[in-house]
Amino acid sequence: TVIPEIDLPGHMLAALTAYPELGCTGGPYEVWGDWGISDDVLCVGKESTMKFLEDVLAEVCELFPSEYVHIGGDECPKVRWEKCPHCQAKIKELGLKDDDHFSAEHYLQCYVTSRMEEFLASKGKKLIGWDEILEGEVAPNATVMSWRGVAGGLQAVRMGHDAIMTPNTFFYLDYYQSLDKENEPLA
């Protein structure tokens, strides 16, 4: 079974380049040719952005028979949301607040994850997200895919969630599979 992944709300430079109105700054944006984490993420304070995500996920649900859809949720800097009037208005509307552990912007991402979980459930699908979705309030039925080690997976299970263990140091096949890099250069 192929489980599709549409990484959101970060890792969206291609979408922002094509649809700059989906971002907090309005662009212009440019697709990167190299790996990286961009401060430019989707503006989740705009209802039009949320509708875009639902439209994309609806199409993904039609294309893939898997009961799961992976929404990513990793590596989403909050710096644009901190200054974005749309995101700040949504934070106020939802009554989100900073606490001792996370910022209101982290809880804004929790809102996005929960909303996407509800949407996917309406299509008969279940949500998977990278272990960053544990930062704040986890969507009630989310499966957590732990890539930054084993701690996230263990935390998810303790919280009653299913977990998929994929710690990058062991399961990323583009990493060296041996400490002997002279004789094992396949990475």
Where are the regions that the model predicts?
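Short, hinge-like loop/turn segments at secondary-structure boundaries
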Residues: P20-G23, Q88, M145-W147, K181-E184
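Substrate-binding cleft of carbohydrate-active enzyme catalytic domains
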Residues: T1-K123
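A generic secondary-structure micro-motif detector
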Residues: H106, A142-T143
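Generic structural hydrophobic/aromatic packing signal, biased to beta-strands
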Residues: L22, L42, L53, I71, ...
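Conserved alpha/beta catalytic core and glycan-binding cleft of carbohydrate-active enzymes
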Residues: G124, G129, L134-P140, W147-A187
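A cross-family glycoside hydrolase active-site/sugar-binding cleft signature
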Residues: I3-P9, H70-D74, I128-W130, M145-W147, ...
